Swiss-Prot record:
It is a multi-pass membrane protein. It holds the Pfam family Na_H_antiport_1. PANTHER family: NA(+)_H(+) ANTIPORTER NHAA (PTHR30341:SF0), SODIUM ION/PROTON ANTIPORTER NHAA-RELATED (PTHR30341). InterPro entries: Na/H_antiporter_dom_sf, NhaA. It catalyses: Na(+)(in) + 2 H(+)(out) = Na(+)(out) + 2 H(+)(in). GO terms for biological process: regulation of pH. Gene3D superfamilies: Na+/H+ antiporter like domain. Keywords: Antiport, Cell inner membrane, Cell membrane, Ion transport, Membrane, Plasmid, Sodium, Sodium transport, Transmembrane, Transmembrane helix, Transport. GO terms for molecular function: sodium:proton antiporter activity. GO terms for cellular component: plasma membrane. HAMAP family: NhaA. It comes from the Bacteria. This is Na(+)/H(+) antiporter NhaA. The gene is nhaA.
Length: 437
């Protein structure tokens, strides 16, 4: 008996939701790992080993080939190098949702886009209003981002009570937020531009597009090209993590081999396996090799790369980023400084206010559609979680602020993340409790 007949048939919707649910499961677990990494960094930064711990991340590291050498601090390699993979995976997820997921509908995609714009504009405006022209005014980009892993981790604690429409809305919003933030970093917080290096990087992207059109599908080739483009952007003055965003959005979302062709190739292998007396062994092995290629290429490049990279990003790169950036000597800090207060208010108040306002305007102006399962009260409660800017906010803060301002800034980010997580969790718990349904 065919074993597949004993299983439920797969519906087309399963092809869309299965990768999405796998993404959520990984992100939920990653949120816990991120929290533990943050606590570890905070603990070590406030012990007798504080100086050694903080100095470790400033150690230079690099490679030299003849007269050419590339040396950066360990923190730089993490923040600019490894975090490129984070943004690459984020861009892959966005591309898949826009091409294959629910966001294929332009009006459905417009809602998280509008919400993300509000979630960036309102906190930046509040921050500038509170800081004025004082120290740290140029750091307005810090309050514009959302920590995807922590937001999904908070939703995971509520389990299945949270509707899928809210999960998708917040995930899409966080992705648009992060991409918007990295674009602002690339433009607003870069160094003076080296146009030769920038042009070289642009030619690299053109080359990648060209070999993709020629049908070259070798991931090592694209990795080598991506590395070369990253080096060019690192030398150009534009923040090199932008390379991850662009390459992620350039990655094909369609598979090369259809299911019909895959089944035909596999049927040929099954009918004439290697060693079968009715087929020549060389031809059968050629068919077997073709089946291996077809099996791999029946999965889209986006999904293959997500499967390969997401665990590394979620369980290695992001925790390493948190450990290297979240070390804040509490004894040297002062929560009462205006900068800290401005960051807390911008995240806790500005984020949800901007998201709700822009979402409401987009729906009322018929620019966007709101899913029926996503009530305004749920949207507002979920938006409270977007004040968790933690890892992304720390990432931008390292670029936007002078070193002497980083301690109060990091405390503001940490305080805002804790407050936003508590408020969002309590609001969603009340709204999704069985007594209210």
């Amino acid at each position: 008996m065919n074993d597949s007949l004993s299983r439920l048939p797969r519906e087309p919707a399963d092809r869309l939701t299965k990768p999405f649910m796998r993404f959520l499961r990984i992100e939920a677990t990653a949120g816990i790992i991120l929290l533990l990494s943050t606590l570890l960094a905070l603990g070590l930064a406030n012990t007798a080993w504080s100086s050694s711990f903080l100095a470790f991340w400033e150690m230079p590291a690099g490679v030299r080939l003849g007269d050419i050498g590339i040396y950066r601090s360990l923190k730089h390699w993490i923040n600019d190098g490894l975090m490129t993979f984070f943004f690459f995976v984020i861009a892959l997820e966005l591309k898949r949702e826009l091409v294959l997921g629910e966001l294929r509908n332009p009006r459905m995609a417009a809602l998280p886009v509008a919400a993300a714009l509000g979630g960036m504009a309102a906190p930046a405006g509040i921050y500038l209003l509170l800081v004025g022209g004082g120290p740290g005014a140029s750091g307005w980009g810090t309050v514009m981002s959302t920590d995807t892993a922590f937001v999904i981790g908070c939703l995971a604690l509520l389990g299945s009570r949270v509707p899928g429409s809210l999960r998708l809305f917040l995930l899409s919003l966080a992705i648009f937020d992060d991409i918007g933030a990295i674009l602002i970093v690339a433009v607003g917080y870069g160094e003076p531009l080296n146009w030769v290096a920038l042009g070289t990087g642009g030619l690299g992207f053109a080359f990648v597009a060209g070999i993709a059109l020629l049908g070259i599908r070798s991931i090592p080739v694209y990795f080598a090209m991506g590395s070369a483009i990253w080096l060019a952007f690192d030398a150009s003055g534009v923040h090199a993590t932008l390379v991850g965003v662009i390459l992620g959005l350039m990655t094909p979302a369609r598979r090369w081999v259809s299911e019909i062709r895959l089944h035909a190739i596999l049927d040929r292998v099954i009918a004439h396996p290697p060693g079968d007396h009715r087929s020549r062994d060389t031809a059968a092995r050629s068919d077997l090799h073709r089946a291996g290629v077809a099996t791999r290429e029946a999965v889209s490049p986006i999904e293959r790369l997500e499967i390969a990279l997401h665990p590394w990003v979620a369980f290695a790169i992001m925790p390493l980023f948190a450990v290297s950036n979240a070390g804040i000597p509490i004894e040297d800090a002062n929560f009462d400084v205006p900068l800290t207060i401005a960051i807390v208010v911008a995240f806790v108040v500005g984020k949800p206010a901007g998201i709700v306002l822009f979402s409401f305007l987009a729906v009322k102006l018929r620019l966007a559609s709101r899913p029926e399962q996503l009530s305004w009260s749920l949207l507002a409660a979920g938006s409270l979680l977007t004040g968790i800017g933690f890892t992304m906010a720390l990432f931008i803060a390292e670029l936007a602020f002078e070193p002497e301002l980083l301690i109060p800034v990091k405390l503001g980010v940490l305080g805002a993340s804790v407050i936003s997580a508590a408020l969002g969790f309590m609001a969603l718990t009340l709204l999704t409790s069985p007594n209210r349904r």
